[in-house]
Amino acid sequence: MSRRIRRRSGIGLGAGPLALVGAMAVSGVIHLVRPAVFERAVPRAMPGSARGWVLVSGVAELACAATTLWPPTRAVGGLASAALMAGVFPANVQMTLDARRPRTRAITLLRLPLQIPLVLWGLQAARSTPR
């Protein structure tokens, strides 16, 4: 399946890294359009406003998606994407701890191990840079 996507997309990304780019682009837009959804995820120990952190992280996700997608910047974009996905892990833990409803807690808890493939896909994208 990865090869089909590579040929069809023409951008040289496998299915995993391409999924990472799509997820980061969608998430980045949601961060900017509906920041209140993410504000409670910002750990209380972070300085400044939660809204500010959410907006900055949305811009960072969009920048990572774009630089990972574009072959000349893919190595840096993939590494930045992996670092960002590792860096937001504390916010995802905070969302799980703050979840009030059992269903919300279950969803946020199940999301935690998904950070691992996201980090790995960022690293994979960085390694797939055309030489």
What do these predicted regions represent?
Residues 1-131:
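Short amphipathic, positively biased membrane-proximal segments
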